[in-house]
């Protein structure tokens, strides 16, 4: 009776989540805890009511609630730390020099990075950085993540006989608005491909492979040459690479069972990989003994045949790819989309080509076809309208020829 929500959360993570769930899932869930703790963490389980959760969900969707917004350095902070003093500050904060250079140049940064710099400088955060996204609120989908986590925690508590029932069962989850899916149209893809010769070779190839296959970022970073049969033109998705705070880079199984899949490659993708394989072999010879010969993948030490690596063969950090991509787009005056938008672009091309939605779902690794239809409903309607027009033209020809 005396256990609080905070105490239950700690118990749930230690005894259920960490032993049974994927590290990435646990990490994602832990990011939700601060808001939950602030809102209902102090409440005893015996006193928790649906109304507490309803109030929490309402708060989540209020303007200004986002903690992951963009932060810019203030003029007073820049004045306090002229160029001669910045290097020591950046080192003390543990911030990468490239990241710091972008911050001093006026680019926005994350709350985490901004806090590290302010703390290292011993300056009040509000004096060092300003939130440039104060009016942003959590999307319905983001707010629903809190409902899913709490529901899972309370279901477990019921099984453990710590609660009589799950209060989430009596609360409607936050509404999810239909989000606009960001993607590149054919012209946008053509412009991106034309700019890629200016990109680092590995990033150029990974962007093209994302467009050709629709694979997720972590799936691409986790690829090995043993996953690819170039003569047959197929690629197998067998693992994903993720960056876990406090643990570093970890290989794990794909997102869902359906995410483990085999994707047929077209001639362009096959040739791209053949050329890239030769480039990588030349790089390995150039690096020589500094090349990392083995890597640990899901508890096993194996020969290093990773497709995408750092200069010395170590696994590439997916987060680095994510931060590089928008900068590259800005430098080449390209539409400001996310790296994940390449996956959406692949789906849009398939749907426009009238590929069956079941095939699209299979290539993307969606657990259910409904996931595909929900995400790409707009694309499907547009494609269906074009199909109806084509059918109408066909019948018009038939009727005209029949009348003739």
Which functions belong to the PLM regions below?
Residues 1-106, 110-158, 170-173, 188-189, ...:
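Short, Lys/Arg-enriched alpha-helical recognition elements, typified by the DNA-recognition helix
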Residues 66-71, 76, 111-115, 134-148, ...:
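Basic, Lys/Arg- and aromatic-enriched nucleic-acid-binding interface segment
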């Amino acid at each position: 009776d005396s256990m609080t929500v905070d105490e239950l959360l700690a118990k749930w993570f230690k005894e259920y989540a960490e032993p049974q769930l994927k590290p990435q899932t646990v990490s994602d869930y832990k990011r939700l805890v601060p808001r939950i703790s602030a809102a209902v963490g102090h409440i005893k389980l015996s006193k928790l009511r649906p109304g507490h959760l309803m109030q929490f969900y309402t708060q989540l969707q209020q303007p200004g609630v986002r903690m992951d917004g963009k932060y810019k350095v203030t003029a007073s902070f820049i004045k306090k730390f002229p160029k001669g003093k910045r290097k020591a500050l950046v080192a003390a904060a543990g911030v990468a020099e490239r990241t710091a250079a972008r911050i001093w140049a006026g680019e926005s940064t994350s709350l985490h990075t901004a806090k590290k710099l302010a703390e290292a400088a011993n300056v009040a955060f509000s004096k060092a950085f300003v939130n440039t996204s104060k009016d942003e609120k959590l999307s319905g989908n983001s707010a629903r993540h809190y409902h899913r986590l709490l529901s899972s925690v309370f279901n477990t508590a019921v099984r453990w006989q710590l609660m009589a029932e799950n209060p989430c069962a009596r609360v409607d989850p936050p509404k999810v608005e239909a989000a606009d899916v960001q993607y590149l149209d054919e012209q946008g893809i053509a412009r991106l491909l034309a700019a890629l010769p200016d990109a680092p070779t590995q990033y150029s190839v990974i962007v093209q492979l994302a467009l050709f296959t629709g694979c997720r970022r972590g799936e691409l970073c986790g690829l090995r040459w043993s996953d690819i049969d170039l003569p047959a033109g197929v690629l197998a998705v067998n693992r994903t690479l993720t960056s876990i705070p406090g643990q570093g880079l970890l290989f794990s199984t794909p997102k869902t069972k359906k995410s483990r899949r085999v994707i047929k490659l077209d001639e362009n993708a096959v040739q791209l990989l053949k050329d890239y394989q030769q480039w990588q072999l030349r790089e390995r010879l150039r690096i020589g003994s500094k090349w990392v010969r083995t890597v640990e993948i899901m508890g096993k030490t194996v020969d290093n045949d990773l497709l995408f690596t750092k200069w010395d063969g170590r696994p590439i950090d997916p987060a680095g790819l994510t931060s590089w991509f928008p900068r590259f787009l800005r430098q080449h005056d390209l539409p400001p989309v996310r790296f994940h938008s390449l996956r959406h672009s692949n789906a849009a091309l398939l749907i426009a080509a009238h590929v069956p939605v079941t095939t699209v779902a299979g290539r993307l690794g969606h657990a259910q076809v409904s996931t595909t239809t929900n995400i790409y409903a707009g694309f499907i309607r547009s494609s269906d309208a074009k199909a109806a027009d084509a059918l109408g033209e066909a019948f018009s020809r038939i009727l005209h020829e029949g009348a003739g």
